């Protein structure tokens, strides 16, 4: 199975691992196909710049940590971007909508504690 960390799960991995569920901790520690979207890096950078996120790590640092833990970084392709148009307007967060579309396009399971994401036709775990 292929897993895509959403932004909150990514932040927990590197700042508060005890906040991850037991299942999410097993996924992160395991030898599995684990990825993060570049969308999460955009979200973190934007929220840091407007003062909505206090996460004392630069994006290049975060990228290095991900790669050091064999977490692949996925770019966002036009197919996933196009897929957003077909998503129902359940979730108002554009970053989460991009992650949902990417997971659907790549046939991945999203690791998330977000309560709204599972309302979409996408696989999730927490």
Q: Which residues make up each language-model segment?
A:
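Alpha-helix capping/helix-boundary segments
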Residues: 9-10, 40, 80, 99, ...
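Short, well-structured N-terminal submotif of metal-dependent ribonuclease cores
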Residues: 1-36, 52-64, 106, 115-119
């Amino acid at each position: 199975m292929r897993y895509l960390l959403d932004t909150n799960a990514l932040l927990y991995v590197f700042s508060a691992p005890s906040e991850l569920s037991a299942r999410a901790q097993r996924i992160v520690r395991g030898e599995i196909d684990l990825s993060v979207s570049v969308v999460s890096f955009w979200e973190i950078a934007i929220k840091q710049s407007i003062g909505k996120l206090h996460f004392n790590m630069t994006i290049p640092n975060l990228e290095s940590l991900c790669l050091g833990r064999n977490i692949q970084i996925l770019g966002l392709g036009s197919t996933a971007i196009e897929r957003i148009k077909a998503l129902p307007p359940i979730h108002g967060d554009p970053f989460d909508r991009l992650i949902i579309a990417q997971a659907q396009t790549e046939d991945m399971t999203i690791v998330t504690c977000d309560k709204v994401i599972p309302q979409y036709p996408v696989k999730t775990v927490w």
